[in-house]
Amino acid sequence: SGTAANELTMLALTHLYPEGGEIITPPLTWISDINSVLFANFEPVFVDINKNNLSFDLDKLENSITDKTRAIFVTHVLGLNALSDRLLKICKDRDIKLIEDVCESHGAMFNDTKLGSIGFASNFSFYFAHHMSTIEGGMISTNDNHFYQLCRALRSHGMTRELTDKDMRQQYIDEHPDLNPDFIFMGPAHNFRSNEINAVLGL
């Protein structure tokens, strides 16, 4: 589900930031965005929206960034693009990861680019009331291979055999020579695996 995608994204971020930190999120969003931050033991920092695209008030957002800010979790509400050149510059200049919630905005664009292909990671929902449905379903997209590998494993109980990066998988095997390589778990995780039947419905 989109909720599972949110939770998995935040769980994977805990492997990048084991010390924790803050996630900036808008108050106008779905509850699973906020819950996913809390479940991962990050601290949500709420920044109010503007009235034009229901995204962050960027002046308030800049004033809310601290040295503990790990990501900006933006929600594209009701098909509206929440991005701007200024927001992307803030993320780039401060080296803060941008997470996109695209659950309500499949197909929307920013500067001729599809939403969900711009941030560090993006979450989609295939709930029956959304643009594309698998009845229930979700997806994470990212261009970062390490983050992708984390998501692959953490969506399947944390099993390192799910890793397609051979070097990353071998590292776990080398660290645990006394364990069966097919049953090494990287830590607490979930079973968020989808199935082919749902995928067919989406097609």
Question: What is each stretch, according to the model?
Answer:
Residues 3, 28-34:
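Conserved coil-to-alpha-helix start sites within the AMP-binding
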Residues 35-37, 90:
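Hydrophobic/aromatic ligand-binding patch that stacks against planar heteroaromatic rings
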